[in-house]
UniProtKB/Swiss-Prot annotation:
Residues 1-22 are cytoplasmic. GO terms for cellular component: cell division site; plasma membrane. InterPro entries: Cell_div_FtsL (IPR011922). The gene is ftsL. This is Cell division protein FtsL. Coiled coil: none annotated.
Length: 89
């Protein structure tokens, strides 16, 4: 008679990996972890680069506004000085 045993493929593969392929399995896990970390690091680097560029643009806008405020303050103080001198004379 023919022996009809049911073999579970996933179980057989798992047993084979545990018994004979510990080093390749460990290397596979290490490669997958390493590649995942490369992807995460690349994403974070790109995100931080974009954020840095946005902050530099904001800094430039604020610097221009600061210079304009200094000019405005100088003009107002000059006008006040002229008014003071005019009222004194």
């Amino acid at each position: 008679m023919i022996d009809r045993k049911h073999y579970h493929l996933v179980g057989s593969i798992g047993k084979d990996i545990l018994n004979n392929g510990k080093l390749p399995a460990l290397l596979l896990i290490a490669v997958l972890a390493s590649s995942s970390l490369v992807v995460i690091t690349t994403y974070q680097t790109r995100r931080l680069t974009v954020e840095r560029e946005q902050l530099l643009l904001e800094q430039n806008i604020l610097d221009i506004e600061w210079r304009n405020l200094i000019l405005e303050d100088n003009v107002i103080s000059d006008q006040s000085r002229f008014e003071f001198v005019a009222t004194e004379q």
